[in-house]
Structure formats: structure tokens, C-alpha cells
């Protein structure tokens, strides 16, 4: 006999289902469940007197016969491809199924077999996202990794050697010696990692040497001289070795203007960092480059979103990061040329239009490594408040009930798009079968601010945890702490290190004594803006050289700075 349960009681028991709506944190962003892969009346849930018990939701199947290692029950998956309710099956550190979990001996339509060897994680009432990817890291200190992990980031790509003056300014790990040491250091860090070599050279030999030493990409930075000759040489090496090139262009226009840089790039794929320009790049019009089909444009989070404090804080940050002297007028003028309210305001709107595809941190070098996801969804909130629903959301025949298209656009900026840009999307960047089980569980009220649980390679690596001497896990002080996957020999199989294919073919991991799985980056040279999910628009962008006003397809792009933001002091005391 069927039993009917009202919608609120159902959501409280099994999590929201199709048509239910959820607010993300304290923003104005409303998510609506698009589909439910579970079966009403056949839901699985763990606990005393509940379903996942021997002979009920738990089968007799062994692991050898197909039972999963872990099941996440009744999860609300938020990813670039959809917003769905489902059970998630994990096995051997990977996602093996998304659908309906249970016991196939007594229930039809089971996609995920629960057996005696299966652990259960309660996904009811939680949003599950892929671990975020921060593709603009200055590896200034190892403490960044824990801070990033605590925010929901599970992959970091960038360059550096520690707090060297070069690293403080540029995301480069220069030379084979330093790349080797950073790859060895990665062995003890609870994060997927990849390192960029220095790409600033006009001849190829030193760049090839770095790729063969394990660099997963090359970085062109103006502080090392991003000339047209260096751009052309670096891209030529990248094309031969299939690694990505990231670029911070010439703010002072000493070696050429933005037109010269576009000409030097020559239609080849390139990831442009802080494409608005406050983080560096041709003043005042580097932002134009986001309209090029071969360019993968990203932002760094200090300008995300545009607020009443954005301009003021940037000057001091810039002086410190780029080793400038406030007593030298030319250094001050250099800094001031990069900070323009008009282009920062336009950046908000270009993100909302899907013309900027990626958001990253610029960690400790004008960016905050623990705020990538927060700043991304603060930007989405600001645009919802100032610009209203996206046309795709407003076109909902039931009225503008949700912000699903906007939410999927912004989640893609910190997950799948940086993965595609850097050739690692076969392994990370989305909640899809076959991918590494790098997953983040959020309580909706804390979404984007403080994860409840971070799963890394199928094992829990970070979680909100109470007093270890308490009788139960929940008494305070509750805060994020590393879990067992971050320790001992469990760390290596839980994480990946990304290298060039050429380095792996020379047996570099064994030569360096690396224990972690070393994965080659692939398909970085044949992609373009069209491959950036939910963020592939190509407006014609123009900048007035006198007023710095930005136009896209002839329309002026401007917005007011935010006076206050969600996901801020309500959650964070410091």
C-alpha cells in the first residue's frame, strides 16, 4: 500500500526532489532540482531502523562481484551539466555510477550495488559539487594547500618555489632543478598539483628542458619580459609538447600593444590570466582579448566582484607583489595604470554574459587562495541583483522560478573549464562517471563558504569536526580539520600530479622517486573558447582609450560597485 508524504517532510528525510528550490548560502541565487534519479518509496538511507541493513538495502554482494566502496545517498548534485538528485557510487577512488543505489536482489533498477564492504555517506540535505580547480597559483608557501582544501579546492595549478622574489610576483617554477623539487614536495601535500615552467625566452632550448623536467604548462609573465618573440617561442614549444601556455601581458606596452600580442599569439590556444587587467596586462585594453576564439580568458579573485573597496585595496597589493617602490614615481604610475574602475565593472558583466570562462585566485600575489568559490558566487549574486535573471532563466515557462542557468555558468568557471583549459578534464573538474572522486559536500546554508566534507580520491580528506575528546563528533569547537586520507601512505593514492606527456615518457616519476599517480596533460592545443562550458560567448569588446569605458557589441558595460555582499561577515569573523 502506497504511503504519501508531504513535500517538506520528504525533503527533510531524503533531501529535496524534482521541483524543490534551495537558496545558496545567503545569496539571491535560487537553485531548483531538475531531475531525481532515485525512486520514491525505494530510497536508501543509513541509520538505526533505516534502509541500508543486511537483506534490505544492503545486498550480499562482495566487492569482487560489483559492490561499491562508498555510496553517497540522496545527494543533490550541482555541476555544469545539471542539477539533479541521485545516489553516487565510488570505487577505487573514482566515480563509477550516478543513479539509484540499493540491493538488486530485492529491488529493480539498481545502478549502484551496496554490499557488506560498502561505506555510507549521508548526502541527504547536502549539495555535492566537484572539487574546485584553482589554475592561477603562486606557490609561495605550503600552507596555501590546507587553506585551499578547506574551501573546497582539490586541484591547484601554478608555479613557484616558495617565498622567492620571483615567485611572489610570477607563477613560474623556473628550471629543471626547481621543478624537480616542487614535484617531490607535492608528495606530502593533500592536493592534486601541477607546475608551470617559465615561458619567457626567445629560443626554445630552455623551455623544452622545463617541459621534459615535468612542467605541465608554461607561463609568460611581464616581469620576466613578455615580448612578441617570447610569446611566439613559448607557444611553438607548447604546440610541440601539448602543454598549455598562460600569459600575463605587457602592462606598460613597452614591447607592443594588445594588437601586437594578438598577432604574436597567431590564433593559437592560450589561457589569459586576469584578463581584465588589474592583475596585469596591456593598459588599458587587454580586456579586448576575451573576444578572441582561441583565448581562454580567466579572472583572479581580488576583482571579484566589483565592490566599494576593490580599487582602494589594489594599489598596496600591487606594490608589494611586483617588487615596486612607492618612493619611485614611475613605479607608482605603473601600479595606477593597472587599476581602472571601468574595466573592473565591465568584468562583472562579461562573466555574467559567459565571455570570461574561468575564475582563479592569484594566491598571495594579489589574490586569496581560500576564496575562489566564495568570490565566484558573490559575483553571480551581484549580477542577479543588478541585472535580474539571465534571459535563459527568465524564459522558464513557469516564470523565473530559479537561477539554474546562471548557477551552472558560474560553477563551470571553477570546475570543468579550468580542467579543460589545462588538459586534465579526463580526470577532474566534474561529477561524472569515470572521474576521480574529488567531491565536496555542502550544507546549502554554507554553500561556497565552508564545506561540510571534502572527499579526495574516494576518501574523506577534510571535514568539519568537533572536539576529539567529546563523546560524539559534533560538540564544539567545530572547525575544518584534515582527515585520514591526508596522512601516511593514504595520501599518495588519494592525489594526482599532472606532468607533460614527454616527461612521463622519459620515466621522470621513477627517476624522482615519486609515489603519487603522475598523469599527463592532454589536448591543450586544439581547444578554444567554444569548449568552455556555459561560458563560450564571443562579444566584440572595445575600450575607449580616453575614458576606459568598455563596450561589448556596441553596448556600454558598466555597473555600480557592491556596498555589501553575501557569504561574508555573516559566516566569517576574521
From Swiss-Prot:
Question: Cofactor(s) for this protein?
Answer: Ni cation
Q: Where Ni(2+) 1 is bound, by residue?
A: 136, 138, 219, 362
Family membership, please give it: Belongs to the metallo-dependent hydrolases superfamily. Urease alpha subunit family.
Residues modified as N6-carboxylysine are 219
Q: Which Gene3D superfamilies match?
A: Metal-dependent hydrolases, Urease, subunit C, domain 1
Q: Which residues are catalytic?
A: 322
One Pfam family linked to the record: Urease_alpha
* Gene Ontology cellular component list: cytoplasm
Subunit record text: Heterotrimer of UreA (gamma), UreB (beta) and UreC (alpha) subunits. Three heterotrimers associate to form the active enzyme.
Q: Looking at the record's lineage, which domain of life comes first?
A: Bacteria
Entry's Gene Ontology BP terms: urea catabolic process
Transmembrane residue ranges: none
Q: Where is this region: Disordered?
A: 384-403
Location in the cell reads: Cytoplasm
Q: Which organism is it from?
A: Prochlorococcus marinus (strain MIT 9313)
- PANTHER family associated with the record: UREASE
Report the EC code(s) recorded for this entry.
3.5.1.5
PTM entry text: Carboxylation allows a single lysine to coordinate two nickel ions.
Q: What class of enzyme is it?
A: hydrolase
Urease domain span: 131-574
**Cytoplasm recorded as keyword:** yes
Respond yes or no to whether keyword Calcium is given for this record. no
Positions binding Ni(2+) 2 in this chain are 219, 248, 274
Q: State the protein's name.
A: Urease subunit alpha
Amino acid at each position: 500500500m502506497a504511503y504519501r508524504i508531504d513535500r517538506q517532510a520528504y525533503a527533510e528525510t531524503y533531501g529535496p526532489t524534482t521541483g524543490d528550490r534551495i537558496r545558496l548560502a545567503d545569496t539571491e541565487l535560487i537553485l531548483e532540482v531538475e531531475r531525481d534519479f532515485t525512486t520514491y518509496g525505494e530510497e536508501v538511507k543509513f541509520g538505526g531502523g533505516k534502509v541500508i541493513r543486511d537483506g534490505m538495502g544492503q545486498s550480499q554482494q562482495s566487492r569482487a562481484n560489483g559492490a561499491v566502496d562508498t555510496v553517497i545517498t540522496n545527494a543533490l548534485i550541482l555541476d555544469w551539466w545539471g542539477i539533479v538528485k541521485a545516489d553516487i557510487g565510488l570505487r577505487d577512488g573514482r566515480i563509477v555510477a550516478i543513479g539509484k543505489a540499493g540491493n538488486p536482489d530485492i529491488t529493480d533498477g539498481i545502478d549502484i550495488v551496496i554490499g557488506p564492504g560498502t561505506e555510507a555517506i549521508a548526502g541527504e540535505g547536502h549539495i555535492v559539487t566537484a572539487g574546485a580547480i584553482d589554475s592561477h597559483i603562486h606557490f609561495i608557501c605550503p600552507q596555501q594547500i590546507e587553506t585551499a582544501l578547506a574551501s573546497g579546492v582539490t586541484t591547484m595549478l601554478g608555479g613557484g618555489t616558495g617565498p622567492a622574489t620571483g615567485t611572489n610576483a610570477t607563477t613560474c617554477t623556473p628550471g629543471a632543478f626547481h621543478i624537480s623539487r616542487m614535484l617531490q614536495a607535492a608528495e606530502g601535500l593533500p592536493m592534486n598539483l601541477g607546475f608551470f615552467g617559465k615561458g619567457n625566452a626567445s629560443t626554445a632550448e630552455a623551455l623544452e628542458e622545463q617541459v621534459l623536467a615535468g612542467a605541465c604548462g608554461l607561463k609568460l609573465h611581464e616581469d620576466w619580459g613578455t615580448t612578441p618573440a617570447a610569446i611566439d617561442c613559448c607557444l611553438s614549444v607548447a604546440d610541440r609538447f601539448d602543454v598549455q601556455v598562460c600569459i600575463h601581458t605587457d602592462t606598460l606596452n613597452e614591447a607592443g600593444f594588445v594588437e601586437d600580442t594578438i598577432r604574436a599569439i597567431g590564433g593559437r590556444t592560450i589561457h589569459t590570466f586576469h584578463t581584465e587587467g588589474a592583475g596585469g596586462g596591456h593598459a588599458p585594453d587587454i580586456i579586448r582579448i576575451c573576444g578572441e576564439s582561441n583565448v581562454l580568458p580567466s579572472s583572479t579573485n581580488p576583482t571579484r566582484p566589483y565592490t566599494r573597496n576593490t580599487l582602494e585595496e589594489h594599489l598596496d597589493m600591487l606594490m608589494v607583489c611586483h617588487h615596486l617602490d612607492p618612493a619611485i614615481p614611475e613605479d607608482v604610475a605603473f601600479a595606477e595604470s593597472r587599476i581602472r574602475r571601468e574595466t573592473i565593472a565591465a568584468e562583472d558583466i562579461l562573466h555574467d554574459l559567459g565571455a570570461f570562462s574561468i575564475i582563479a585566485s592569484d594566491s598571495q600575489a594579489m589574490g586569496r587562495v581560500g576564496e575562489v568559490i566564495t568570490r565566484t558566487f558573490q559575483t553571480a549574486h551581484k549580477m542577479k541583483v543588478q541585472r535580474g535573471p539571465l534571459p535563459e532563466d527568465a524564459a522558464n515557462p513557469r516564470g523565473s522560478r530559479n537561477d539554474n542557468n546562471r548557477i551552472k555558468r558560474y560553477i563551470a568557471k571553477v570546475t570543468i573549464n579550468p580542467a579543460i583549459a589545462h588538459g586534465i578534464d579526463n580526470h577532474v573538474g566534474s561529477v561524472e562517471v569515470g572521474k576521480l572522486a574529488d567531491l565536496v559536500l555542502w550544507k546549502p546554508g554554507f554553500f561556497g563558504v565552508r564545506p561540510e566534507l571534502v572527499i579526495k580520491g574516494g576518501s574523506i580528506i577534510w571535514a568539519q569536526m568537533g572536539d576529539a575528546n567529546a563523546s560524539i563528533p559534533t560538540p564544539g569547537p567545530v572547525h575544518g580539520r584534515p582527515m585520514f586520507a591526508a596522512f601516511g601512505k593514504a595520501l599518495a593514492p588519494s592525489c594526482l600530479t599532472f606532468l607533460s606527456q614527454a616527461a612521463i615518457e622519459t620515466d621522470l616519476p621513477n627517476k624522482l622517486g615519486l609515489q603519487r599517480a603522475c598523469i599527463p596533460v592532454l589536448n591543450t592545443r586544439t581547444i578554444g573558447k567554444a569548449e568552455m562550458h556555459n561560458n563560450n560567448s564571443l562579444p566584440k569588446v572595445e575600450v575607449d582609450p580616453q575614458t576606459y569605458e568598455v563596450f561589448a557589441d556596441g553596448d556600454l558595460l558598466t555597473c555600480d560597485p557592491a556596498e555589501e555582499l553575501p557569504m561574508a561577515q555573516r559566516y566569517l569573523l576574521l
